[in-house]
């Protein structure tokens, strides 16, 4: 008789019970990167909302019950009212991220129908929009090329199976078809017009307001970067289409919970009334002189160490937002004993201590865009420890 081996159950060790994520110092060139948890709250914002957040997390709440009528209510009602007041939109829906928004819209409104979309708007970044749309059950009719698409390309693509004209925000496009022209074409042929803003250009928030002013059938974007909030996908648009999405069975799998709704409400509140509390607002409004002063302060702390230290001009970027560079400065370091501690070893040892940098031509570079003075002190201490052990 063959021996039957059973798989041993893994033991629950103390290491498995440690907090799974730790704070890092982001001295890389990518701000609000997905690998780093994307956006984050400022300390003053968190301190302000912490008492209410504690109440929501430690008690039952009226998430879906109306205390005035004793009837069931929509969990989105408080946020819908605020969003409508802020953006003058007909209707709103919130799902767990913008990818969910794209998938839900395509699945609920264009399954087995054609979505006409520019080829160039499916190119670039890690987010594979084409796969998401195809997985929804919709068919894609690609028009144009990687850098140019004209209105006539959309018009020639239309047929009896066409259901939606789809546009994705792409600032790198050389020849872009204005969304208002797509809207006119959609209206002419009784089609849905949908604008996927994705990660809205945070240095130009008018992009969102301009599209909303056109009263699109549908619009979606990411909440975390736009409002410095939790991960969520915001769908706005005409009531007819948003109601169809809300009543679709898939929506229940994609809807957000009480924590997301609470944090999103307070983020939008701060976005309207107290922008100084928003981390994104503070970082993106740094002057070039302020960034240089940050670089000089870090330089002064690192210069006494056994390092070659210099300052250079550089660029940072917002996550995977294509085509947007932020002027900045970096502090470049190199060990004076490169045999014992070359650039790659130094980069790795910093990484292991939670200090995320970039490496360029044997130099380790600290991008100062996301750093603060407490970070400078920690970086100096970590480097001193690494050099003493080298």
UniProtKB/Swiss-Prot annotation:
Keyword Lyase: no
Annotated catalysed reactions: L-seryl-tRNA(Sec) + selenophosphate + H(+) = L-selenocysteinyl-tRNA(Sec) + phosphate
EC number, as in UniProt: 2.9.1.1
GO MF annotation, one: L-seryl-tRNA(Sec) selenium transferase activity
Enzyme class (EC, first level): transferase
GO cellular component entries: cytoplasm
Subcellular location: Cytoplasm
Keywords associated with the record: Cytoplasm, Protein biosynthesis, Pyridoxal phosphate, Selenium, Transferase
Principal subcellular localization: cytoplasm
Role: Converts seryl-tRNA(Sec) to selenocysteinyl-tRNA(Sec) required for selenoprotein biosynthesis.
HAMAP family: SelA
PANTHER family found in the cross-reference section: L-SERYL-TRNA(SEC) SELENIUM TRANSFERASE
Membership in a protein family: Belongs to the SelA family.
Protein name: L-seryl-tRNA(Sec) selenium transferase
Organism of this sequence: Helicobacter pylori (strain P12)
Highest classification ranks of the organism: Bacteria, Pseudomonadati, Campylobacterota, Epsilonproteobacteria, Campylobacterales
Gene from which this protein is expressed: selA
């Amino acid at each position: 008789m063959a021996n039957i081996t059973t798989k041993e159950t893994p033991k629950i060790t103390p290491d498995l019970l440690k907090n799974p994520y730790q704070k890092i110092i982001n001295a890389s060139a990518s701000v609000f990167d997905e690998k780093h948890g994307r956006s984050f709250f400022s300390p003053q914002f968190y301190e302000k909302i912490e008492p209410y957040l504690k109440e929501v997390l430690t008690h039952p709440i009226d998430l879906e019950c109306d205390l005035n009528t004793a009837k069931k209510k929509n969990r989105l009602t408080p946020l819908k009212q605020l969003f409508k007041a802020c953006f003058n939109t007909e209707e709103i829906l919130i799902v767990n991220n913008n990818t969910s928004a794209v998938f839900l819209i395509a699945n609920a409104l264009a399954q087995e129908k054609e979505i006409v979309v520019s080829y160039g708007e499916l190119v670039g970044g890690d987010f594979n929009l084409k796969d998401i749309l195809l997985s929804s059950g919709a068919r894609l009719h690609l028009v144009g090329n990687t850098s140019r698409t004209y209105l006539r390309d959309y018009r020639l693509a239309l047929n009896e199976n066409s259901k939606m004209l789809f546009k994705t925000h792409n600032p790198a496009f050389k020849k872009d078809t204005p969304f208002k022209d797509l809207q006119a074409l959609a209206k002419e042929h009784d089609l849905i017009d949908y604008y996927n803003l994705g990660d809205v250009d945070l240095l130009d928030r008018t992009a969102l307001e301009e599209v909303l002013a056109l009263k699109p059938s549908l619009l979606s974007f990411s909440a975390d970067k736009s409002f410095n909030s939790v991960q969520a996908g915001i769908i706005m648009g005409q009531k007819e289409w948003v109601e169809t999405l809300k009543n679709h069975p898939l929506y229940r799998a994609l809807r957000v919970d009480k924590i997301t709704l609470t944090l999103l409400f307070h983020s939008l509140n701060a976005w309207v009334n107290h922008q100084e509390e928003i981390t994104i607002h503070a970082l993106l409004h740094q002057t070039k002189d302020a960034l240089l002063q940050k670089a000089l302060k870090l330089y002064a702390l690192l210069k006494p160490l056994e390092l070659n230290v210099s300052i250079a001009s550089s660029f940072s970027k917002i996550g995977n937002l294509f085509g947007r560079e932020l002027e900045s400065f970096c502090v470049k370091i190199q060990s004076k004993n490169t045999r014992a501690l070359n650039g790659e070893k130094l980069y790795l040892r910093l990484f292991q201590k939670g200090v995320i940098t970039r490496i360029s031509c044997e130099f380790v570079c600290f991008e100062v865009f996301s750093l603060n003075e407490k970070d400078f002190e920690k970086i100096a201490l970590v480097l001193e420890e690494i050099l003493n052990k080298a």
